[in-house]
């Protein structure tokens, strides 16, 4: 079956933003204007099409990124039909993992900013993730009708805070309640949207007299940015500033956007139906198609480098980037096709797990509505039914031409809670529910505490775990009670311990056990665990060296201070001995474990705690209360700035997670409910000795 839309007319984009910047409303408008969704879903009344989990509708935040396909022929109907696959991404910091995994499969992103709040903490996180995956982006400054709206301030913030080069291709006509439309700096015309038709109709008009000078000033900056795309254009521009044609400007801006050198910037009010269609045109004009993106890299089963180009003629390759449980069809695996073609019924290789599976039905999603399709091709995003083995980050490919694409990395959880079902009868059901949810979300973990037998759930923040417990009740009918949140401490060492030996000897008639290992242990900040084999002269036979490493790895799970996982240590295996008859893998595993425990005791072990980046927005009158409260929580204030439009102060601080439980309640009472805050995990830092002692004692009492 031939391709309906040429790959050059595909756009795989994400819409990402800080919570409350109006991202879901923007996505809803896109679905409306592209004719997919006939009634605009409003977040205010809990009817948004994209926010399809019940909790999202209640909380008014987007949790799971749903993938949606829409078609667009341009605002004025002057483009050939383009296919836009939109991945909706959450803006709450507890769901950063969702943003991370969608960035991995996108070709371009539209960053939505609040015209008043501007660049907020989550905007910085999302920007970093887009940089990491080299995702070209455009910026849409939303809510231009709000009091305090300031398009140009957001433009400056993108430069100052995000180090991005934002190039306005529009400027607003009016602001706050006088916001009417935009000036298109490429065409040098004003665009005014008609309220009666919900913005479907619009007119091009002359630029209002009071904006002509400003429009010329910003057009000049835009054309200059475009001219830097090539020597020829620059020369042409320097000869005559007005010599670049509309097509030349667009092509040059596109080239520089795809190279991640600039970020074209637009504005509007999605809620007031202004500016969204022009943003869709910009998606087509400036963001890449799958064909504009470099070939994706991976390696074959022999670890040789391999690549796949975005073409139907290449062998099939795809990445599973999300798993969801659907009440009607069971497990859905969302995947992005990088190359080749696959039909329902074909056999695929899951190269990551080296298992073959038959592809059942293929569904294309529109939020939570679905359409069954026969095949998918390079550049498509779809959902598969019937893949039992696939999990997030797995590569699916042609069994005859295997490739493993680069895996996704997921952060370690920072908070955990004990959880138990309200009725004993639900124990098994709870286990199944938690395992299913952990399969869907790689940043959520479930384990059993070996000492207490309790089920422990871990995640990226309090809201993350709240929603897991909530989903367990709604989707699986299991009500659970949760314990107090516990901080995920870590242990590491401060100094070097050399020549530490571990000897495991059991010789009591018959075959004995003998393992002897000597190690050096040193700090390895920020690099995790490393094991170096420095054995010379065969004092430990080759086949037993992995056993020493295994023994140490098992011991890393529980440190010597308080039984927390050990991180950032480097172990050198330097010496040892063996017995011809009695040595075996188990003996060397035990020797490695004993040596490591002893070395850790000697190397000044310390406790590490997660530090959170906290930002508080508060009216100025309560500034003292907020600062005092943060200091009492061992917080270090790192900066303050005015919120534009007389909106109070923004305080940035770094605070230990252990001190942040219950913060929202105390912030409310300290500021009469007028302050808001966000926090996200920053890094691990050494715990002060008095806190460390308290944590260790509490752990020992718990064990005792």
UniProtKB/Swiss-Prot annotation:
Which terms does the UniProt entry file under GO BP? ribosome disassembly
Asked whether the keyword Transferase is assigned, the reply is no
UniProt keyword Nucleotide-binding present: yes
Q: What is its main location?
A: cytoplasm
Per UniProt, where does GTP bind? 17-24, 88-92, 142-145
The tr-type G domain covers which part of the protein? Answer: 8-291
Per UniProt, the keywords (alphabetical) are: Cytoplasm, Elongation factor, GTP-binding, Nucleotide-binding, Protein biosynthesis
Which first-to-last residue range defines the signal peptide?
Answer: none
Q: What GO MF annotations does this protein's record show?
A: GTP binding; GTPase activity; guanosine tetraphosphate binding; translation elongation factor activity
Could you tell me which NCBIfam families the record lists for this protein? EF-G, PRK12740.1-5, small_GTP
The family line of this record is: Belongs to the TRAFAC class translation factor GTPase superfamily. Classic translation factor GTPase family. EF-G/EF-2 subfamily.
Query: Its function?
Result: Catalyzes the GTP-dependent ribosomal translocation step during translation elongation. During this step, the ribosome changes from the pre-translocational (PRE) to the post-translocational (POST) state as the newly formed A-site-bound peptidyl-tRNA and P-site-bound deacylated tRNA move to the P and E sites, respectively. Catalyzes the coordinated movement of the two tRNA molecules, the mRNA and conformational changes in the ribosome.
* Protein name as it appears in the record: Elongation factor G 1
From which source organism is this entry?
Burkholderia pseudomallei (strain 1710b)
